[in-house]
Amino acid sequence: MKLTCVVIVAVLLLTACQLITADDSRGTQEHRALRSDTKLSMLTLRCESYGKPCGIYNDCCNACDPAKKTCT
């Protein structure tokens, strides 16, 4: 009977500690794991089609015409 009471009190104490720390740390995680769609978008090369402007930040699918600064 005493052992059962000790186990119940220990479980309640651990549960309370987890709930308290979960409330305190909400939104403060520094190094969050990237979601799979974020990882995929970072790995996907996006290119601009024909006639779109190109430059340092925009990559063309084929080539960039430096005179017109458009994709060819």
From Swiss-Prot:
Domain notes: The presence of a 'disulfide through disulfide knot' structurally defines this protein as a knottin. The cysteine framework is VI/VII (C-C-CC-C-C).
Main location: secreted
InterPro entries in the cross-refs: Conotoxin
Keyword line: Disulfide bond, Knottin, Secreted, Signal, Toxin
Organism (species): Conus striatus
Subcellular compartments: Secreted
Signal sequence residues: 1-22
GO molecular function terms attached to this record: ion channel inhibitor activity; toxin activity
Protein name in the entry: Conotoxin 3
GO cellular component: extracellular region
Tissue note: Expressed by the venom duct.
Disulfide bridge partners, by residue number: 47-61, 54-64, 60-71
Similarity section: Belongs to the conotoxin O1 superfamily.
Positions of the propeptide segment: 23-46
